Amino acid sequence: MAQFPLFQKFQKAIQHPPALSLGLPIFLTVIFLLSQRYVWIEDDLELRSTALTNFELNRISFYPLVHATWFHLLLNLVALQPIVSQFERVNGTVRTGIVLNILAVVTAIPWCLLSIGFFPDEAVLGSSAWIFSFMGYWAIRESSKQPTTQLAPNLVVPTWLLPIIYLVVIAIVIPSSSFIGHLLGLIAGWMMALGYLDVLIEPSSKVVLWIENKISRVIDLIPSSIVTFYREEGALDTRAAARADTNRSLSVSGGNFLGFQANSSQADLEAGTRSRGNSSVDPTTSFPGTGQTLGTQ
């Protein structure tokens, strides 16, 4: 029986989804259900202006885990899962978890500083900042190949600015949403794509491998037919090749966004060139990665 190409792609995508991208929606849903029963969960995790001055690390790190309503949760899950999944296939499962935490903190700190002076009584929660961070990240990545995008016959905009449109639309459609929080999340994603967060999101592979070793028993408990765990060893080549492709394209275009230069080095380019020669994966297309299916060695 003939199948439509779109259906085939969808069918392939759901056969072995990345481990974190599958587990995160489940985990967020469980947290939401618990928070409806135990209201202290939301009270303890929502981000407030005092989180920084009181050194409340639980709020600074975990505010994306709690949501106000079912609609809030479902809207974020639908938008978050595919973009995190694509990132995980390139960068590995454990490293993606590290990136999620770093993005939450990088967004929270400036929000707290601004809120002290401008909106001290506000509190924010939810994973929408993650969504805008990854939208910003992928917009920069895409702009290295397609600098501009035509939205209408007489309207052409820089590709890296496309998330701004979503930012404005969300602010209009959902006025109760945190425009500043979304904007700071978007800026964090731009910074990550340009390499300015590498010192935070690029821990040594030895650290990631150590974490993978510690959770290996948990990984093996999940049937291999359900998800794919993208191990650090397999992600090294795809990550280096993807970084090199972006840096090379940004170098050709000048790599300048709002006056900021892409933070790349010749070593990145050379490493990516070597990796691409050893990898059968084309990171500029499907970002499939070199995953380790759960339950296997």
From Swiss-Prot:
Report which superkingdom the organism of origin falls in: Eukaryota
Ranges that cross the membrane: 14-34, 60-80, 98-118, 120-140, 155-175, 179-199
Q: How does it sit in the membrane?
A: Multi-pass membrane protein
- Active site at which residues? S128, H182
Q: What class of enzyme is it?
A: hydrolase
Polar residues bias: where? 275-297
Give me the reactions it catalyses: Cleaves type-1 transmembrane domains using a catalytic dyad composed of serine and histidine that are contributed by different transmembrane domains
- The UniProt annotation puts the region (Disordered) at 268-297
What Gene Ontology biological process does one annotation of this record name? Answer: proteolysis
Protein localization:
Golgi apparatus membrane; Golgi apparatus, cis-Golgi network membrane
Please give the Gene Ontology molecular function terms for this protein. serine-type endopeptidase activity
EC id: 3.4.21.105
Write out the entry's keywords from A to Z: Golgi apparatus, Hydrolase, Membrane, Protease, Serine protease, Transmembrane, Transmembrane helix
- SUPFAM superfamilies this protein is in? Rhomboid-like
What Gene3D superfamilies is this protein classified in?
Rhomboid-like
- Can you list the GO cellular component terms from the UniProt entry? Golgi membrane
Provide the function of this protein.
Probable rhomboid-type serine protease that catalyzes intramembrane proteolysis.
Q: Identify its protein family.
A: Belongs to the peptidase S54 family.
> What protein name does the entry list?
Rhomboid-type serine protease 2
Organism the protein comes from: Yarrowia lipolytica (strain CLIB 122 / E 150)
